[in-house]
Amino acid sequence: MIFQSFILGNLVSLCMKIINSVVVVGLYYGFMTTFSIGPSYLFLLRARVMEEGEEGTEKKVSATTGFIAGQLMMFISIYYAPLHLALGRPHTITVLALPYLLFHFFWNNPKHFFDYGSTTRNSMRNLSIQCVFLNNLIFQLFNHFLLPSSMLARLVNIYMFRCNNKMLFVTSSFVGWLIGHILFMKWVGLVLVWMQQKNSIRSNVLIRFNKYLVSELRNSMARIFSILLFITCIYYLGRIPSPIFTKKLKVKETSETEERDVEIEKTFERGGTKQGQEVSAEEDPSPSLFSEEKEDPDKIEETEEIRVNGKEKKKTKHEFHLRFKETCDKNSPVYETSYLDGNQENSKFEIFQLFKEKKEEKYLLWFEKPLVTLLFDYKRWTRPLRYKKNNRFENAVRNEMSHYFFYACRSDGKERISFTYPASLSTFLDMIKKNNYFFATEKLSSDEFSTHWNYTNNQKIKNLSKEFRNRLEGLDKGSLIRDILEKRTQLCNDKTKKKYLPKTYDPLLNGPYRGRIKKFFSPPILNTTYIKNKIRTPWINKIHNLIFINDYHEFEQTIDRFNRKSFSSEEVRSLLTEREREHIDSEDRIKSLNFLFDAVITDPNDQKIRKKAIKEISKRVPRWSYKLIDNVYQELGEYDENVRGKHAFRSRKAKRLVVAVDHQTKGDVSLPHYLEQSDFRRYIIKGSMRAQRRKTVIWKPVQANAHSPLFLDRIDKTLYLSFDISQLMKVILRNWMVKNKNQKLSDYTNAKTRKLDKKEKKKLKGERYQRQEMVRIKQAEGWDKRLLTRILRSSMLVIQSILRKYIVLPLLIIAKNVVRILLFQDPEWSEDFKDWNREIYVKCTYSGVNLSETEFPKNWLIEGIQIKILFPFHLKPWHGSTIQSSHKDPKSEQETDVCFLTIFGLETDMPFGSPQKRRSFFEPIFKELKKKIRKLKTKSFIVLRDFKEGKIKELSKINLREIEKLRETQKNSIISKQMIHEPSIEISSMDWTKLSRTEKKMKDLTNRTSRIRNQIYKITKEKKKGSLTQETNISSNKPTYSVKILDPSKRIWRILKKRNARLIRKSYLFLKFGIEKIYRNIFISTLTIPRINTKPFRESTRKQMKIIEKNIHNNEANPERINKTNKNRIISTIQKLISKTSNKNSKISCNLLSFSQSQAYVFYKLLQVPILNFYNLRPVLQYHGTSLFLKNEIKDFFEKHGIFNYQLRHKPLWNFGRNTRKHCLSGHYQYDLSRIKWARLVPQEWRNRANQHCMAQNKDLIKRDSYEKNGLTHYEKQHFFEADLLRNQKSNFKKHYRYDLLSYKSLNYEDKKDSYIDRSLVQVNNKEEYYSNYNRKKVKLLAMLGSISINNYIGEDDIMDMEKFLYRKYFDWRILNFCLRNKANMEAWVDMDTGTSSNQNTRIGSNNYQKINAINNRVPFYLTIHQDEEINPSTQKGFFCDWMGMNEEILSCPISNPESWFFPEFVLLFNAYRTKPWIIPIKLLLFNFNGNSKKNRTGKKEADLFISPTQKEYFELSNQSKEENELADQGTPRSDAQKQVILGSVLSNQEKDGEENYTGSDMKTRIKKKQSKRETEVQLDFFLKRYLCLQLRWRGAVSFREKILNDMQVYCHLVRLINPSDVAIASIQRGEMSLPILITKKKFALKELTKGGMLIIEPRRLSVKNDGQFFLYQIVGIALVHKNKRKITKRYQEKGYVDKKDFDEFIAKHQKMTGNRNKNHYDLLVPETILLPKRRRELRTLICFNSKNQNGMQKNPVFFNNGKGGGRVLDKNKNLAREKNQLIQLKFFIWANSRLEDLICMNRYWFNTNNGSRFSMVRVHMYPRLKIR
């Protein structure tokens, strides 16, 4: 078995080696190349198939030989560079393919030049066989394009980059191609034989067999192939840039030798610079080389190597390599000349050589240059390239050069090809290799280099570990920390004065991110002071010496060329003209600037050369040799003389939308209006071949939209024969439903179908509207396609307007009134002509913008015009009264108020719309005639009715007895009919089975009616018998009383009979309506109950909670006051519970307020149980995730007050290592950041809070010491720590070790006892204790809102690049008044709403607002929302409800009150979100809100981030002077509370201002009061600048474009009218002007607009460009606590805050603190922090790259020795072992598991990369999840 497995393993490995070998891969790629069929296959197939006989065999052999030889040349060209250059250039195809294809076409088409039948014995001398060979050979060299693509042919080229043995790979790929070719030809032969043997194919019914068909086909084969080749030729013309049919760009260059010589001599005299170029281009009237192009002197030398007849020519323009440098003054650019060879004399010689070459080139290439440019310039404009404009250079860089390219580099110990290798590095490396003979030329193999790489890394690890161990040993010996810590080396500028460079300029601190110090001196200062102070030995660039070692000895002493006296002589200036004097002055200025960089100065003391210049390795970038502009710049050229010419590239089709006309400048304010069609142009240069475009392809015969080939798979490709199955099913179902329409459905289904019919009608209406809109757009595009159509339409519209106004309408008025006169009616001349005068013709632009009645738009005949008719005239037969007109439909009035004129003189609603259907002139006439006819009919009917009534009266005179007899007989007949009717029903009921469904229902209905009728008859008969007298004489002739009573009963019976039948028929509907009515009444009554009772309940709860807040905060003075004042059962139960579990004298924090009524309700429900076992809540409180039943506030409140079992804190915690990242991060509030913060990595102030949480206040949950006794001590420590932190915060802000948060905080939490790095800074004394890990979660983002400005969380961290733009901030626009004229209005922008409490013991909070008076100091304007819970009830209503004066009306509304008793904790964040939207994530709204008024003093530390640098200096000075005073004022808690300042309010005491007014209200304004005069101007400037950072969004269904543009059209028209009131009223009535948008007040506040819901103005995020320095200073870090971080003063040491001896003692997080209560303990300091961050990163990286441990984390060998824990540093406290706690194990690794943002952050920071695309250079291995031993 072992032998078999051994053999099997060897076989598998052998097979893998064979598969991965170069030969097999080459065979595979060569075989794949066979399927790339090109045009050469046509000749090969013709020779193989059509040729017969001996000559045919020879032609087959020659075709096959030429085919194989051509393919072999293609493979060899891959390896052989000269052949590749000859066949790979685009001009090769242009030279070879087109003439050869055209020759074949004209050779084979008209006649045969060679007789294929006559052959000689020597077949090689036969020209036809040679042509067959050449055809197959040459066509094989062309590009493969036919089937399927050229990608298969390029597979071999691509794999060449990865292959080491290239020649073997080329050979094997050729063999593979040969095998594939032989197989393909054999397959073709088999197919042909099969087709000859198949008689069914030859004798097809559709193809009539002809015995001469084969011979005719064989004779015409040459012609068929010539046609195919002609098609190929045309296809190549589409793909290759043809120099014949394209548009030429005119590059204007003068060819006069004298002017060119003069220009070159001028540049030669100026030392190779073109300093006078701009001046000569602007002022010299004579044309020069640069005068026509108006180019900057930034043009880069452009060289192209051209191979013509084996010679290389060099075409060079006189453009010298200049680099543009921006100086401090942007208006005065300085040009710095940089020579690649570093020698100025050599540059002069090179310029002279270029001058001579240019003169020779002029004579040699006077006829060759045009031909060469036309045929071989493959970089010309005909390529489908986009013209990319670069603002720093005049000409644009070609879009064909990549910033990176392929290059072999070493990565992870192996040589790999990097496709993102910087070009400058490879250029630099090549220069060093050529010039430095010390450079190693031999190449190491990959294995040797990997071994060498590993050896080097191991040596580095040993050295670093040894140094690290030595430092730790020194720490164990008790050495000072300042001696142990590694120091940074800082570059000193002066040894005596010890002036250090700024951090941004120090190369030892910032490396490649340092900047350049720009110092400028005038020439006299340079000669006097600069040289005296800088007498030193010369410093020569070592890199320059290394690269240009041959040119180093050619340096010689030169005298300063610049001498100002030679240019400022008045004698010389008097001899020159004014133009020449200006010319020389401009040259002086440019020379003086250039002198700062290029002058070679001679030091008289040491006679050494000092060259003040910066050598930079730069690359020549190919640029366009011409400057192109678009149509926008072409229009600007009409006003700007510097921009001239016609646009040379095609931009998107657009029309000028003229919004208004500026009468001062006499110009139009226009916007581009783009047509609603796809953009096929895509800014392609004119004349470029569109068929060569790769990103916009056309694959259909007719294609409406431009698509990219990347998204072709997402486009529905519908075939011609395809059909939609769903539509077909709909048609079938519809037909089936039509067949069964005779079946009567129920009323319910009928109602449903009616609803569906309504929906379908709406849908059809919308589709009809869309169809009309599409027709309108097509008409507009049709008119817009041609210039002639627009001219024709514009002229037709003007003619139609004149005809309509002055000819047609007056003629109609005359005709109408003449007819009225003929009909003897009054004429209406005045009314008609009044309406005619009211009609106004407004000239509009092509897109419909109103201009004026008289003036035409600019270029209206070419661009087009629209004519809008206001109050169009409609001829009326008569003018009615106002009463009749008031009943008209307002919609019809709106339709007729405005319209557009068509070219046929008709009216339409919108431009290019269909004509409107107007009311006919005769329609009201016909209506009136119909009314008169109807009245006539009614009158005639009345006459006839009267006549009929008279006849009836005459008939009533008949004898009554005869009538009675008739009645009796009628009665008998009715009874008899009833008797006969019943059996008929019974008889017919026997045939029910044969009846239809409807007939059955009718029978049932008749039976029911007959039954009811009989019952009614019986009942009436019985009643009649009881009511009548018994003396009834039936035989008497006179009618008795009983007979008279029977008549009304019969009538009643008949009425009931009809109504019962109707009631039975409609019973279903009655029942339905009744049920709906009952349901509605019940439902509405239930809805009204909470609406009635909610308001008083909410008022009562609000009052109760205010009492709760007041009582809870005042329980220090009166602990029993709560039970007296609060009679509510909820709070009394809570208070009893708290009193049982905590000391009565302890301070109850205000966490209760955070969950307000809603949490109180939950407490009430929990505490209703009389005996509550809190041990049952243990799993709920222990779980650190999201609880399903309890909110986080309840859980944290229970934990803080020790309500649950105290032993819980000693139990093992939740295992975060097995949780997901969400649980891991949510369990620790340091990670409670928004996604925006994690994405941008910009939490500046949060890093200071990460290590300094809240100061603990209880020793242990068992002891629960009261806070009241030692409150001042806690405040002192907090205050002094903050004061010290404030002074050092600016320096801490720029520390390098911000990356530590990501590396230290990313530890795996599976082992709970190893989570020490997460521990925060805690200062402990006898009365204080730290928070344990289980309740760490309580300090949430919202928990700090009481002490820290909420803007620290929502504003500061989310603005990018806050280092550079600290004064740029979000701004709230909802409170600003638009009138910026008065300072009073400025101060009224913000409501100074401060709230205080009457009790002195309570610490007072306020509404921390800021005045805008400090804006001129560039202080960020932000609004701090209310942060304290102890607010007066009178002001609390204003806090929640009347926020910034925005909700005066909403305050009285009980439903929309923000202070909802359901979610009161959302109010603070909601208000902050309204101040700065899109900052607070939704996730944070559900976190804790534990505001503590005691923490208000800590707010100064975060607010320092918002203070400008000038204010900070003042603030630091004031803090230093007040520290002594604050120590004296710490006598009692009451005096300390009185020291608290109402934040945001303006106090007179400057000491308090400096202490608490940290929000930067107007600190510097009080120091410099003179600046208040310019305050309004600065505020206005502030207003306008912030306006640019906002975006506007409209609320409502109407889009912004439609609503605003409609109003703008009306406004632009009203401005031009003399009396616009009538037109304005009419437009308001028509709905064209929206009154909410129309601003009528001069002074208004934006809150009125936002309150109405019309406008929503939201801030837009600032956009800045991120560079390396941004990522350097914005990376998240943790504040390390050591002496360099915190300068510990003597006061701290006296108070016991810092103890040096306890600095290195580390306490486990879950260990009891009973033995160490009197000691101070800090965060666990990672010992590696002794090293500098750079060395620390290097050590960890080397450990991770070289460690082979796969079972655990990557460990530091200093601490981990065979699984043993820590060193002596960590073993000092031996009590840890007695408590059965494991020793601390420090586990380090580079990045966290599965956290890509950490990897990106560290990647950029560690490897100094500021570009995301360079991450592929750093091949970092993502380790799997690390395990715990």
Swiss-Prot record:
Show the GO cellular component annotation of the record.
chloroplast inner membrane
Membrane-topology annotation of the record: Multi-pass membrane protein
| Record note on quaternary structure | Part of the Tic complex.
Entry-linked PANTHER family: PROTEIN TIC 214, PROTEIN TIC 214-RELATED
Which ranges does the record mark as transmembrane?
18-38, 67-87, 90-110, 127-147, 174-194, 224-244
Q: What is this protein called?
A: Protein TIC 214
Predominant location category: plastid
Its lineage opens with: Eukaryota, Viridiplantae, Streptophyta, Embryophyta, Tracheophyta
Q: Any miscellaneous information on file?
A: There is a partial copy of the N-terminus (positions 1-363) of ycf1 in the inverted repeat (ABI49067).
Q: Which UniProt keywords apply?
A: Chloroplast, Membrane, Plastid, Plastid inner membrane, Protein transport, Transmembrane, Transmembrane helix, Transport
What this protein is reported to do is described as:
Involved in protein precursor import into chloroplasts. May be part of an intermediate translocation complex acting as a protein-conducting channel at the inner envelope.
One GO-annotated biological process of the protein: protein transport
Q: Identify its protein family.
A: Belongs to the TIC214 family.
Locate the region Disordered.
260-301
> Which gene produces this protein?
TIC214
- Would the keyword Plastid turn up in this protein's UniProt record? yes
Location within or outside the cell? Plastid, Chloroplast inner membrane
Where does this protein have compositionally biased stretches of type Basic and acidic residues? 260-272
InterPro entries membership? TIC214
